Design a protein with these regions (language model features):
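Feature recognizes metal-dependent phosphohydrolase scaffolds
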Residues: 1-650
Length: 650
């Protein structure tokens, strides 16, 4: 036995000091390895739509309903099954309404408790008792474990269960117990959650989504371009801060910053109202303005314009600082004829839709005015010192990454930058060229430096690279030749708005190219999949989210209402359970109120993308590999005990 191996086994013998102890652990671990794999739930592109996100989280993209159907099959009507599912999603709210209608609540409690116990029992069946025990609510842990655990050898099980349930009702704890069971079922039907990018964007509730995710039992996040933008803003990067505020203003969601995060926008509002007092700001209409009062709308439009002009200025400064980012070609303020109200692009002269720029000095167009400089400095301080925002960003850093390899699948938001021939594109980052997986690793390293580096130069590079990742032509999270923000505001010619996508998006059906990406990330091309967020799938035009014969799954979550008109549906989510991969296409979510009152679930059409020939077990997963290594180590310890190389400590 080699010295290092012997030293390791000696250490292991401290934990398992006898043949009996090591043998028991092997049996326990082997039992776990043989259990069915837990259900993974993939969501992408939530875009701040909290209500729809919360509902999909509660129903597990149909996993809860499937579990109810499995348990009650033909023994319950469809309506009763839907009522039970709604109760599981919204136990407190549903019971409030039931109390108004039901004559005999004790009977109702008894029926529902029995039904919920059966669903909980089925949901817990694929886990070890230890894992289920950890998921149990403290107040009812012992009782729930008694009710959902099979008791062989008990002669009068029914009487035993009846007595427990009767006591729960009698002492007035039925409703709390029902809530506990419902939340347990929600937790058990999904073992692990993957968020494949873009928690943030145009919707009103990204801060609420972050709060929800921080409470979730098991989650990982692959950063989207909007997530990186907020991370850059939280790190104090001025271009990112201006973009974040502009997008919130554009969609009428400045409340996210003011109420959600407590960031003071009053200096910006005062400045905008003064500078653009007589300007109608018609190019800066809000995308969502139905709920705005006229005066509030007017102020928002002025703030929208003020921060947009500031954004173009600070981006112009940053573009000069980092010419390798390729943003100098996106500088437009120096190409404007301020007397004529025109701009020269590509040798052509275009009329601007808005030519009122009171804060721009034509001789030095990218210089902030004294007031703009003060506003930006205050905003940098506000973003960096906002405790809640920093807490949310730390969570994104702790649970997130640019890509994730999980159970032989490759998860990322956006694209792997490619050349037109499908080869990996080399991208220059601070003087060095990178491609493929190395590009992701280097970029992620700089993102973390933007928060944690001790060297101020490295920290600044990290912050500024987040701005590039947000909208750079060769950024894996963006993947277009430009972000046509300026053109969309100021130019009527729609041909100037076009954003050319990276070749990756044209090559999604090319098996050689997709296999090359899997090879690059060290995955088995025969069994692995690429799970890709970011791009809305236009189902109404016949587009399919399943690409390359099932090797690539493009699952934009479609939570953003703006995209639902383009796609025809409310996006896709993915379930990967022990039977295979299930893709769910969702209809738009009406509202939480309708889900409770009218029992309107999100209607989902599920398609089995891949059914496994044999049911997948824990042994087939990443956790299973670790457990098998542990078993092999324990077997080596047993051999050492039996051969006398290591003495039992008994």
């Amino acid at each position: 036995m080699k010295a290092l191996e012997e030293k390791y086994l000696e250490g292991l013998s401290e934990l398992f000091p006898s043949i009996a102890a090591a043998s028991t652990e092997i049996i326990n671990l082997q039992a776990i390895v043989n259990l069915p794999k837990g259900t993974e739930h993939f969501l992408t592109d939530i875009h701040g739509e909290y209500e729809a996100f919360a509902h999909v989280l509660k129903n597990g993209s149909g996993s809860v309903k499937r579990k109810v159907d499995d348990v009650f099959a033909n023994t319950m009507s469809s309506r009763d099954k839907q009522t039970l599912a709604t109760l599981i999603y919204y136990p407190r709210e549903k019971m409030e309404r039931i109390r108004e209608e039901e004559q005999n609540m004790d009977d109702w409690y008894k029926i529902m408790l029995y039904r919920l116990i059966e669903v909980a029992k089925r949901s817990a069946s694929k886990y070890t008792r230890s894992k289920v025990r950890k998921a149990l609510p403290k107040d009812f842990a012992y009782v729930i474990e008694e009710l959902i655990t099979e008791k062989s050898g008990m002669t009068d099980k029914e009487s035993y269960y009846n007595s427990i349930i009767s006591t729960i009702i009698q002492i007035g704890r039925a409703e709390e117990f029902i809530v506990a069971l419902c939340e347990l079922i929600q937790r058990l039907v999904v073992d692990h959650l993957h968020i494949v990018g873009d928690i943030y964007d145009r919707g009103p509730g990204p801060h609420l989504i972050m709060d929800k995710l921080m409470e979730y039992h098991s989650v990982d996040i692959q950063w989207g371009n909007h997530d990186i933008l907020w991370m850059g803003a939280a790190a104090g990067q001025k271009c990112c801060i201006a973009n974040v505020i502009r997008i919130c203003a554009r969609y009428g969601n400045l409340d996210i910053l003011e109420d959600g995060y407590g960031i003071n926008l009053l200096p910006l509002a005062t400045f905008a109202w003064k500078q653009y007092a007589k300007d109608p700001c018609e190019c800066f209409l809000l995308k969502e303005q139905d709920n705005c009062k006229p005066q509030e709308l007017e102020l928002n439009m002025k703030m929208h314009k003020a921060i947009s002009v500031i954004q173009f200025k600070v981006e112009g400064q940053a573009a000069e600082l980092y010419p390798e980012f390729g943003f100098q070609r996106r500088n437009f303020l120096d190409k404007i004829n301020y007397e004529e109200g025109t701009i020269t692009i590509g040798g052509k002269i275009y009329q601007l839709l808005d030519d009122y720029f009171p804060t721009i000095d034509p001789k030095n167009p990218y210089q902030l005015s004294a007031e703009e400089e003060e506003i930006m400095n205050r905003l940098v301080k506000a973003f960096q010192s906002c405790e809640k925002l920093q807490r949310h960003m730390r969570f994104l850093l702790n649970k997130g990454s640019l890509y994730k390899i999980y159970n032989s699948n490759l998860l990322y938001h956006g694209c792997v930058p490619l050349n037109d021939d499908g080869s990996l594109r080399k991208v220059k980052i601070y003087g060095k060229s990178y491609q493929g997986r190395t590009l992701y690793d280097v970029m992620e390293s700089y993102v973390r430096k933007g928060f944690f580096a001790v060297d101020p130069d490295e920290k600044k590079k990290g912050r500024d690279l987040m701005w590039y990742i947000w909208q750079g032509a060769n950024s894996p999270l963006f993947g277009k030749d430009k972000m046509a923000t300026f053109e969309r505001y100021f130019l009527a010619e729609k041909e100037l708005w076009k954003e050319k996508k990276n070749a990756y998006y044209l090559l999604l059906e090319d098996e050689n190219v997709m296999n090359g990406i899997l090879d690059e990330f060290g995955l088995d091309r025969e069994i692995s999949h690429i799970i890709n967020g970011h791009v809305p799938v236009k189902t109404k035009n016949g587009e399919n989210p399943v690409k390359c014969g099932g090797k690539v799954l493009v699952i934009d979550g479609g939570f953003s209402k703006a995209y639902q008109k383009e796609t025809g549906i409310a996006g896709y989510t993915l379930i990967y359970n022990s039977y295979g991969l299930i893709l769910a296409a969702h209809d738009p979510f009406e509202s939480t109120e309708a889900a409770i009152e009218k029992e309107r679930d999100i209607h989902s059409d599920s398609v089995i993308v891949k059914r496994t020939l044999e049911r997948k077990t824990v042994g087939d997963t990443d956790v299973g590999k670790v457990l098998k290594e542990r078993i092999a180590d324990l077997e080596a310890l047993l051999d050492a005990y039996r051969s006398g190389q290591i003495i039992e400590k008994v």
